[in-house]
Amino acid sequence: MDPDRQADIAALAATLTTVERVLDVDGLRDRIQKLEQEASDPNLWDDQSRAQKVTSELSHAQNELRRVEELRQRVEDLPVLYEMAAEEEGQDAENAGAEADAELAKLRVDIEAMEVRTLLSGEYDEREAVVTIRSGAGGVDAADWAEMLMRMYIRWAEQHDYPVEVFDTSYAEEAGIKSATFAVHAPYAYGTLSVEQGTHRLVRISPFDNQSRRQTSFADVEVLPVVETTDHIDVPETDLRVDVYRSSGPGGQSVNTTDSAVRLTHIPTGIVVTCQNEKSQLQNKVAAMRVLQAKLLARKKQEERAELDALKGDGGSSWGNQMRSYVLHPYQMVKDLRTEYEVGNPSAVLDGDIDGFLEAGIRWRNRRDDD
């Protein structure tokens, strides 16, 4: 085998060994065994919230172990592919060598993607995520853009078999949404999606403009970790104002004949959370409370970071303003303004193919935090 190819394979094997060590593959197997025992308990579904958490964590752990084991097998198979190519002659040898090179390149990409998972070591990175999208400047185009972003993230979650729970959708009058809040129920969803926080900019020919003029629209994305009991985010009833109303759909159309939608106002901070997608008022209140607790946790951590930055004489780093540009006209390009990562296929990106942006963002964040 070519010495350069041997060196490439050895480097990939070493990287994968590091990934296996960081992920604690043996511990992962033990965790799967315990979760399987818990999932087999016939009484588990008496607590649906707990059952969903167990099954989601089990599925994620099984998929993670399967990915690592498949990568290890592919690393071990790669030298065999090159040996088989060396035994061929003429065009067959050339074709077999090209196939081995293609597998080497693909394996490098897949191992690097798995390596990114080991970078998710922040305090809340392993949590599930609550995502809120709000339309910004740009009128009806911005509302349509906010809905396109919501679809993009939901499609991404679906492609990874991550359950999504929509808490609230506030529809705009003509098209699109004013805002939406949903949860992605998967381990490490917060650590992965938190790099999406910021302002997303769309440039396109407006489908709502009779003169087909180019329009720039903005939408803001907020990503929060789901709060757990260990976070001790207690909200006394005396700090809440609870309003109920009828759920509404696109164009303000009522979709419920009872006052099941809930709006929570946290009086001390002025934070407002609404939820209307559950069937009952109680379910909507519980869901709204989960989102409110996530926002209060984020506010608490933001205040702590601000105090630390003040002590350090550091203005702090903000994700605010533009972080990614999606250009559909006059050319086609999606570019992250922090990482410089770009893709010339906006249709695929808007259909949920954002793993490249997520991986680049996670690496960028870790480099920034190390500086």
Curated annotation (Swiss-Prot):
It is found in: Cytoplasm. Keywords: Cytoplasm, Methylation, Protein biosynthesis. InterPro entries: PCRF, Pep_chain_release_fac_I, Pep_chain_release_fac_I_sf, PrfB. One of its GO terms (molecular function) is translation release factor activity, codon specific. The keyword Cytoplasm applies. The keyword GTP-binding does not apply. Methylated by PrmC. Methylation increases the termination efficiency of RF2. The modification N5-methylglutamine is found at residue 253. Pfam families: PCRF (PF03462), RF-1 (PF00472). Belongs to the prokaryotic/mitochondrial release factor family. Peptide chain release factor 2 directs the termination of translation in response to the peptide chain termination codons UGA and UAA. This is Peptide chain release factor 2.
